[in-house]
Amino acid sequence: MCIDKLGTIHLSWVWRETGDVSTNHDLCYARSMDGGITWYKSTGEKYQLPITATNAEYVYKIPQNSELINTTGMCASDDGSPMIATYWRDGVKNLPQYFLVYQEGNGWKKSQISSRKTDFTLSGGGTKRIPISRPVVLTRKKNGMQQVLMVFRDSERSDKASIAICSDLTKPLWVISDLNKIGVGSWEPSCDKQLWAEKGLLNLYLQQSDQVDGEGISTMAPQPVYVLENPEL
């Protein structure tokens, strides 16, 4: 979920059929201009509440067993166009990758962000130990273009806090770099979004963490918390 500069609430979600994470499927969208009282599709069509699998707007169809995570990152451009960042396996022969799904004109487009080389599965119940994090996605105007930034963590990059930047979605080239020098384990990114919205400054909350698969118990000692302040972007 995110709230744009005009106060519109943008909401995206996936459906799950059972407690098994692998049954996650499909990416849906709704928006509200009155604080959540009434909801609309991106087309302007008003939802008849409650929103169900039958009447929801499907912005991208993703089948079960696609390693689709059940939490998405969201932001909106200056004109209120929503952007959704998440990851899934786009085709049975492909590896799980990060993608940006974004509204452009009257439709939705998809841009592949990563080129990962390592496979994994989300099959099974409980909290999973996953080699990549859920993403945080941000956007800003830079040099007259709507720039998109995605913060994430990936074991292929030694579990550092990393960022992928696309300077022009009409020519979606993503440049990936690391924001720190030390791995942060199973860290999931979080940032001060109000500071980003008001001043364009990125402050990240960092802490070395450990997630044991299937609700296991970690033996890691308590770790210090620190803030990575406004890295060069």
Across the structure, where does each feature detected by a protein language model lie?
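Extracellular, repeat-based ectodomains that mediate carbohydrate processing or recognition
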Residues: 1-233
